[in-house]
Amino acid sequence: MGLFFFVDFPLYYLENLIKIDTGITGDYTNVGAYNFTFPKIYKQVLGVGINVYKTGTAATLENVYVTGFNNTGFSFVKDCVEAARANTVKVAYTVFYV
């Protein structure tokens, strides 16, 4: 019965189930753990993708890693090859939600 229902289920009902929002955070300079709160609360966040956003010349390699997320924000760690020369960066993020 479930297979029959799914086969006959019109595809237009499946459109727009997963939505995407993007944004850019404020500035982060120091190496460490941070939390970012989304500008709005989502019903259900499925995932978050992040990337380092740097304008100008970088003095050293920067990395950011997602450590967790929920419906109101995400947490991440900013790491740097040479912590003493850390650059000021922003984090570009993508939120996947329903």
Task: Label each region the model flagged.
Residues 69-78:
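Cysteine-clustered segments with highest specificity for TGF-beta superfamily mature ligands
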Residues 64, 74, 93:
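A broad, low-specificity signal marking well-ordered, structured residues that form hydrophobic/aromatic
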Residues 1-44, 77-98:
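Extracellular receptor-binding modules and their adjoining Ser/Thr/Gly/Asp/Asn-rich linkers
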Residues 50-52, 62-64, 83, 88-90:
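General "foldedness" signal
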Residues 11, 62-69:
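Short, exposed beta-strand/loop patches in secreted or surface proteins that constitute
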